[in-house]
Amino acid sequence: MATLFWLIVFLGACFALIYNRVELRLSTAILGAVLVAFTSFSGAGLFWLFILWVLFGGFALLNVEALRRERLSAPILDVLKKLLPRLSDTERAALEAGSVWWEGELFSGMPDWRQLTRLPAPKLTEAEQAFLDGPTEELCSLAEEWPITHDLQDMPEPVWDFIREKGFFSLIIPEEYGGKGFSPLAISMILAKLASHTGTTSTTVGVPNSLGPAELLLHYGTEEQKQRWLPGLASAQEIPCFALTSIHAGSDATGLVDSGVVCKGEFDGEEIIGIRLNWDKRYITLAPVATVLGLAFKLYDPDHLIGDRDEYGITAALIPTDLPGVEIGNRHLPIGIPFQNGPTRGKDVFVPLDCIIGGKEMAGEGWRMLVELLSAGRGIVLPSNAVGGAMAAVYATGAYARIRRQFKVPISEFHGIGEALARMTGYTYIMTAASRVTCTALNEGEKPAVPTAILKYHNTEMSRRVANDAMD
């Protein structure tokens, strides 16, 4: 009986040390003391005591760092390297993109919640609040979903004019280039407000203020490119889109086959070294009405005109849509929502090297650009649209449940209906809170890749569940 008791004490000590992640040397001392007590009082046989002391001796040797690394860590690492697939450069770029924010505490296993509560809550500036209360509310009153969706299959011209006039396409562009220079929180709240009224408007406004020509130029463009394009984008004289999705690759961005070959050609009457582009993209929002096309393609230089490499990889460039060979105008109709979305094609389109965002020095850096900017951008547009859609569903469903009566009682009084309404409200609260706390990081200049990816998935998924409950 004594042996069983001390065995339980010994195993309990091992479990407690592991659970609390006690430092190795202290763990060794504690286990040694417990083993001495076990040897003295348990009455166990010499054979089992010998086994336990041998195991403890092996454990104690782990305190010799050089020996541990050479005899244990290195062989285990070699085995794991052979078992794990080799990371490609594109995969490594995706994994290393962005920054680590408070979520690092979560993944440590021992998060400091006080650190989260000490973070400053993001607030709107006076200009941002005025824009949310003024032009955003006006746009909601102008854009009526029924005629947009069922009669016009587009936003009416007064709505387009209002969006241009009030600078809705320039929310992320700094004031020095004619934009609003709003914070991520402000953009998130503006898009959520628009999405609570009409998905067409929120999507149309969201695209120029997310991953696209303006954001790429702000982070990677040359000063000449910024001066050339940003004022026009801010005033909406230029309508941007970003063509990433290849018809052959879909969401596998690294598998795109759209190509650009460095060669000599004629541009504006002069023979220059440029890029001859061929692409076939689809599901590109704003492509049917775009004047400038952000294009992702794979760059090749078979004649080594710009360097000693044959292939540079994914590259991002800005292409005016009025160039010969560029095809836009056709439309898709995603799930019946008539925001401008469609295919774009290019056949032997010749452009100068300075169309590459950041200049020719950034050739082949397109994938890195995209994954770094996605680390922040995906935490704003889709999550905000999901919040706005969920809010609209909760408002409409809750009101309907109060005025719709069955058996002389509002259906909101029925437990089944009340349960669905409670679930919808809870999901909407979670989505809103998650968006706000993520905007806290974005407002501080962080690019938290993991939280934004989690937020994008869960907000859209919870929005789908809210929609299901609303329809039920």
Predicted feature descriptions by range:
Residues G329, P343-R378, Y395-S412:
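A glycine-rich, basic-preceded beta-loop-alpha segment at the flavin cofactor/substrate interface
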